[in-house]
Amino acid sequence: KDDDTIVLRVSTWEEYIDLGDWDEEETIDLESGDIIGENSMIEDFEAWYEETYGRKVKVEYSTFGTNEDLYNMLTLGDVYDLVCPSEYMFMKLMAEDMLVPLSDHFYDTSDPNNYYAIGVSPYIKGIFDAKTIGGEPWSKYAAGYMWGVTGIVYNPDVVTEEEASTWKILNNSKFKRQVTIKDNVRDSYFAAVGAIKSDL
């Protein structure tokens, strides 16, 4: 192994990072010519990082099924550079002094490759700056990467906008085994209520 290689240990939700293991019929050809599902996002990131910064990075990737699984992994001694729990779990980890502050570079907008710092919603950044635990802002230890993402993703060649405009699509027999929801317990409860209530 090259001693100059940076090792980045990442743990996030199952199915959140594309591992490039799609079957041929699952790949998506975009108008741009890109093919989604052809490469692993991890391999693409490693290549991009070396091309951009001139240093090799090796991503060691693991997943968890629930926030509590991640918490158990951490309390049993697993160590990661980046974890992606829900807000209540990062708050618990922060309160229990289990997180390391983000680097000074994390919010550096002078780096044109710092896509998070440049592109983060001012609203989300403001919340993370204002909310505190133990007198320290959330933004010292965490960054919001998703906010209000509960919804329906659909293929317009198969489903109309009108059909996808209601949670009732989830219990419409016409779409049996053709639609799914985000693999998240809390979001699933919300979607189930939406599917059951006829006025939503």
Pin down the residues of each PLM region.
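Early extracytoplasmic/lumenal segment of secretory-pathway proteins
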Residues: 2-96
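Hinge/lid segment of periplasmic solute-binding proteins
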Residues: 56, 65, 91-147, 161-168
